[in-house]
Amino acid sequence: MANSAQARKRARQASAQRDHNMSQRSELRTAIKKVRKAIEAGDKAAAQAVYQSSVSVIDSIADKQIIHKNKAARHKSRLSLAVKGMA
């Protein structure tokens, strides 16, 4: 348990930041799932539209350093390949 006022404040801040970061990660996972679902449905136009919006989410979260930029690039690359590979 934090004893000093400074340590208590840092604990509060860490908790708030953790909650915010978890919600951002959840948003990331949801965006990726939406693209995968559109690909499975076979609708290329919808998949491309959802992919564009998910790229924005991925970049935003990487810019905030919630995920590493290389992980963001990997997600974008794999989703792009999946969308382009649709028949």
Swiss-Prot record:
It comes from the Bacteria. Pfam families: Ribosomal_S20p. One of its GO terms (molecular function) is small ribosomal subunit rRNA binding. The keyword Ribonucleoprotein applies. GO terms for cellular component: cytosol; small ribosomal subunit. One of its GO terms (biological process) is translation. Residues 1-28 are annotated as: Disordered. Keywords: Ribonucleoprotein, Ribosomal protein, RNA-binding, rRNA-binding. NCBIfam families: S20. PANTHER family: 30S RIBOSOMAL PROTEIN S20 (PTHR33398), SMALL RIBOSOMAL SUBUNIT PROTEIN BS20C (PTHR33398:SF1). This is Small ribosomal subunit protein bS20.
